[in-house]
């Protein structure tokens, strides 16, 4: 706790005096830093080019948002200090100052901003990285910093799974906020939650909390459903002409399905859709269709933001822009389900932002028959995405209007084309 109070005090003094808290010579990694930051310091000292890119990203972020109330990490040393602070906080406590807007003051808004600020720092587009094949020309995709982001995400996730991350007052905060749905009678008894991640991956009280619709495809999770994307005969996503994505790996369905799968080419000419889970959603995922489980895999990827983060000075909020394609590089899982009438369906939970944990239930086994709506796994803290892919010859008609769906509600009708 001493480091936390020191961080608050230091930032407060800087704000009062209107000066930078930066230091020209950050200390050697010792006990004053967390293990994650010690690792980062060593990586930066061993890789001066990447260190320079990170420093430029931090500086560029400070030029975009110089307001220290909302952007306290404006030097490399301050970035180290911020990460030390960040990975020992609940998501809604990460940002000391909240936006004055109604959204920014809400628990959901503070959580959203607590997740997004880190990515704003490392999401800055850098000229040196343009046209070099990165998803975005940002330092978050440059090694070894890119790999360290997994350390950062894992370190925060580990703390969020400790008893220190949960108590009765934290429960009261979320229980009193309707955005989290705890007053609806949907979930298991709160006495089962002994950490923030226990709460975040909470179970339903009974199957009746999420009735399963009589539709070909149901929502695999509480989520915001998106549109359909066509897959070409070359197994590449077909992008609208106004969507500029230049690297082939961001459209390759085989790459999305992952190395080592027997089904990398099975969806050429088919259709893809995806649905986004927000941070306050129920974060367990269920089978969208009935059928036989033919493959069950985990696919390692990067711990990236799932898009890029920008700053709106008027509202004092960070906001996100994500194009289809980020799923190709994120940590994800893949289940191949063979249906009786409509061939193979791929269901792919995708970790986003500080989420790098997609977890299948241990009871799932290849060759099992699974019923539509059966629980299959869960995410730990953050926002996330679920991709569903259908084969050539299957006509997919969406049954939603883009509004939020609960798991089990009608998502799509399937037919033969």
Locate the predicted segments by residue.
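Bacterial Sec-dependent N-terminal signal peptides
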Residues: 2-3, 18-34
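Bacterial N-terminal signal peptides that target proteins for export
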Residues: 1-9
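Contiguous, well-folded functional domains in the mature portion of proteins
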Residues: 29-417
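Bacterial N-terminal signal peptides
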Residues: 9-18
């Amino acid at each position: 706790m001493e480091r936390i109070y020191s961080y608050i005090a230091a930032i407060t003094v800087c704000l009062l005096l209107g000066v930078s808290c930066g230091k020209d010579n950050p200390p050697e990694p010792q006990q004053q830093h967390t293990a994650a930051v010690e690792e980062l310091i060593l990586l930066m000292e061993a890789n001066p080019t990447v260190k320079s890119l990170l420093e430029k990203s931090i500086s560029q972020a400070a030029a975009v948002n110089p307001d220290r109330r909302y952007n306290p990490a404006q030097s490399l040393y301050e970035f180290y200090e911020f990460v030390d602070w960040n990975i020992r906080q609940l998501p809604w406590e990460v940002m000391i100052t909240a936006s004055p807007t109604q959204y920014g003051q809400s628990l959901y808004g503070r959580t959203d901003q607590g997740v997004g600020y880190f990515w704003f720092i490392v999401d800055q587009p850098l000229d040196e990285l343009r046209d070099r094949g990165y998803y975005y020309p940002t330092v978050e995709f440059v090694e070894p910093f890119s790999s360290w982001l997994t350390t950062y995400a894992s370190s925060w996730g580990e703390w969020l799974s400790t008893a220190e991350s949960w108590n009765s007052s934290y429960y009261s905060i979320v229980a009193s906020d309707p955005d989290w749905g705890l007053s609806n009678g949907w979930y298991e008894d709160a006495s089962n939650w002994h950490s923030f991640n226990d709460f975040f991956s909470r179970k339903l009280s009974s199957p009746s909390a999420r009735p399963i619709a009589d539709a070909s495809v149901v929502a695999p999770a509480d989520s915001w459903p998106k549109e359909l994307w066509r897959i070409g005969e070359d197994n590449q996503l077909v992008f609208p002409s106004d969507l500029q994505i230049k690297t082939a790996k961001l459209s390759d369905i085989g790459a999305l399905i992952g190395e080592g799968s027997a089904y990398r080419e099975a969806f050429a000419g088919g259709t893809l859709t995806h649905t986004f889970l927000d941070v306050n959603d129920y974060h367990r995922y269920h089978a969208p269709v009935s059928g036989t489980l033919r493959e069950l895999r985990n696919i390692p990827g990067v711990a990236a933001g799932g898009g890029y983060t920008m700053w709106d000075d008027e509202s004092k909020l960070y906001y996100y822009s994500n194009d289809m394609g980020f799923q190709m590089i994120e940590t994800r899982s893949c289940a191949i389900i063979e249906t009786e009438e409509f061939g193979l369906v791929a269901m792919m939970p995708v970790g986003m932002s500080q989420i790098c944990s997609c977890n299948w239930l241990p009871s799932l086994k290849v060759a099992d028959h699974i019923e539509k709506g059966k629980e299959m796994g869960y995410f730990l803290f953050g926002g996330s995405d679920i991709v569903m892919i259908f084969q050539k010859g299957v006509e997919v008609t969406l049954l939603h209007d883009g509004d939020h769906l609960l798991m089990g509600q009608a998502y799509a009708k399937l037919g033969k084309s």
